[in-house]
C-alpha cells in the first residue's frame, strides 16, 4: 500500500439487480458517517444490471435516503495487490429519520429472520457456495481446457487462488475452499457457516473481493449463471440449517424420513410449495433459466432429494469419520439460485417460505430418488413434482400468482423488483441466447 495514498472506505448496498453500489469516504469521514450514513436515492434501487433506470418505477426522480453503515459488516484486506487496501462496509438503507426503508433487501432479510424467531423460536445458520468463471481472454488463460477439479487447473492461474484465499481470510470471511471446478476456467468459493445475515454479507464480500483479485491478475471474474451459452453454468448454492433458542441444532432427527426434524421437514415443505413463486427472487436473470434445466446439475423441478445434485432442495450428507456426530453437520442445500439474485432477498424468500411451511404444519415433502424428467406426468403429479418456470418472465408471472409470496414483501419493493426485471427482459429482446449470455457474462 502506497504511503502517499489514503485508502477509501466504500459504504455500500446491494440492489435488486444484485449489483453492489455505494460511495467512498476517507477513514476520517467514514467515522463521522457511522451515525448519519451517506446520501442515497430511491431510484437507485431501480438500476438494472445494464446501467439503465427501469421506467416506470415507484420512485421517479424524487426522494432521499441514507445508507447507514454496519461496522459488523466491514470487509477489509490489503492483500489484493492494489495500491490501496480493499475496504467495504455494508449498510442498511434508511429514511432520513433513521427508520428502516421498506425496499431495502438487507432490512427484509432481517425482518424475515425476526419473524421466524418470533413464531418458532428458531434461527437460521447459512452459507453460500458461489461459482465463477475467469472469462476467456483473461491473462494467462489456457489455450485448451484443463482437467476439471485438477491441481493443474488450480495452479495454472497461480497465485490467483492463494491470493484470493488470503484476501478472504484477512477480510474475515472465513473461506473454507477456493477450488477449480468442473467448467473451463471455473472456480468455486465456500465459506464457514454462520448466522444468516452474516452469510449474505459474506456472499456480497466474496463477489467483490474476487473481482478485485481477478482484476489485479489481469483477468475478469464473472459470476453470471451462463457466461457463455456453450459453457457450464455458475450457481449459488445456499446451505441452511435451523438452530433452537439455545443455539443447538434443530434440523436433524435420525428417526424421521431423510433425517429431517419435524420443523425442518415443514420448513422444506414450505419452500417446495412456494418454489415456483420465489424462484424469480433466487434466480433473477434472463439466462438463469438456460441453466435451470434437466440434466444440468442445477434444478428444474419442485423436488426434495437426498444427496442428489439435480434436486432443488438437496439433503446433504454427514461424515462419521473419527466418530463425528451428524447433528451439527446436517443441512439442506437450496440449488435454484445464482448471482443475478440479491443474496438478502433470495435468503429472505427461502426463510419466508420455510416459515409458512412451519406455520401451516405441512408434512415433509416426499424424498424423490429418481429423475423427474423421465417420469410420467401422472407420477410427477403424485409426487408433487412441478417444472420450475422456464423463463424469467414466467418466473415473474408465477411470483405474481402466489398471494403468499406477494404478501411477504412490501409492495414498493416488489414493484421495483418487477420493474427492474421486466426492463432487463426488454433490453434482451431480439438477442439470441448466446448474445444474452455474453451480455450478462460481462456484467456479473
Predicted segments with their positions:
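Structured core elements
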Residues: 10-12, 24, 90, 133, ...
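ATP/Mg2+-dependent ligation/transfer catalytic cores
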Residues: 1-180, 199-202, 345, 383-444
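Secondary-structure transition/capping motifs at alpha-helix termini
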Residues: 19, 118-121, 196, 200, ...
